[in-house]
Amino acid sequence: MFGPNTNTLATLVTDFSHRDTKFIQLYKSLQKCMLEIAGLDPYKYDVLFIGGSGTLSIESVFWSVKKPIDVIGNGGLWYEKWTTLSEQQPKNRMLGSHNLYCQLETSNGETFEEPDCIVDGISSFPYYDIPKNPKIFVTCSNKQLGALAGLGIVFIRKTFWEEIQSDKIFSYMNLARYRTYGVIGQTPTTAPVAVFQHLK
């Protein structure tokens, strides 16, 4: 973790599972809280929680979006990683593509901002404003939010779901499955309950 929050002291007592009513309440509460912190309209955006990391969440975006993803912005380590990942996801370009960029490239300290894109905000949120009208915005529980590591946070514009693979496709990287489970306050995989508690 970096930024002003360099140390995290946590003592957590978890006495419920990820399928418990307490977790469902925690999940729904955290959804509302994160949308408020992000300043995103709950009628226009959904928020998903993915056990793992911000990097895994970005990989899930590449896996889930139907069209190819072009990486734009300043060069740097994460620009190169996402470009490589994009090249490893061959998709038909006949119907267009979507742009993705890293808002704060930590390898060189450069920032980039463009509206109406997919945004890697893992190292920028919440100290940098979310760019205007993002299709998807990805961050994580640790880094600048200062909670325990292990939870990716993905905001998706509701009108963008038509660009996402069906929830019928079984994969732990399928964002649509996280949306389906999120409606009932759960995740499709075992959730890191302690991280949810600490983030709240």
Regions found by a protein language model. Give the residues of each.
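Short, well-ordered beta-strand core segments
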Residues: N99, C117, F137, G152-V154
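Conserved N-terminal alpha-helix of the aminotransferase class I/II PLP-enzyme fold
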Residues: A10-S60, L77
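Conserved active-site segment immediately N-terminal to the catalytic lysine
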Residues: P131-N142
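Gly/Ser/Thr-rich loops at beta-strand to alpha-helix junctions
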Residues: F2, G51-S57, N74-Y79, E105-S107, ...
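Active-site C-terminal subdomain of aminotransferase-like
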Residues: G3, N142-K200
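Buried hydrophobic positions in well-ordered alpha/beta secondary-structure cores of metabolic enzymes
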Residues: T11-L12, G54, S86, D120, ...
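PLP-dependent aminotransferase-like
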Residues: L56, W63-N99
